[in-house]
């Protein structure tokens, strides 16, 4: 029994593969006619031309919030104010966890949905319901639970795998593997998770990911070093 509590697993829509950034136009159009894009200068230089083309083809306008720093009240408040003033009907967060978390909170403050585009395979923020926000001095405030998880997540492997330092992918592999002992500990010993179908499913998925990455993680890194992306 969940005592009428809301159950939410992850993004409502998830795409992964080479070239899936082209989906950004049609997915944005499902949410309206104008997007607020939260993205830093480095990522924008790599993606601007394609994003402009894909949004234009779907008749979606956009305004950009030039992100820098961390997921702070200043950043997500400024972003949301710009989005509201410009009449934006959705938010797109592009980059790493800090930019994406900022976009998710800005969307929550605006009362609209968010599309996430991670540029690293070490970015779990793109599908997580919560955001982690910080003070200006870098100290953590805590978790910010938005009303909705991401509407859609686009993991373009041409960007997140092939155009990203390999150390980030290695970090992502280890982070994903750590979920199995973390979830198992909290189910059996820690007492943080209630035992039910949802937590047990999470443990099974985490175990499967752990086993797959233990077996194939090293070979995947070797292939990426050669510029190869395949079913493995």
Predicted regions and their residues:
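A glycine/threonine-rich phosphate-anchoring loop and its flanking beta-alpha core
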Residues: 12, 110-205
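Active-site segments that bind and position negatively charged phosphate/pyrophosphate groups
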Residues: 195-232
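Alpha-helical scaffold segments in soluble metabolic enzymes
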Residues: 23-27, 50, 78, 82, ...
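A short, small-residue-rich loop immediately preceding and capping a beta-strand
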Residues: 83-121
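Short, conserved catalytic/metal-binding motifs centered on acidic residues
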Residues: 17, 97, 177
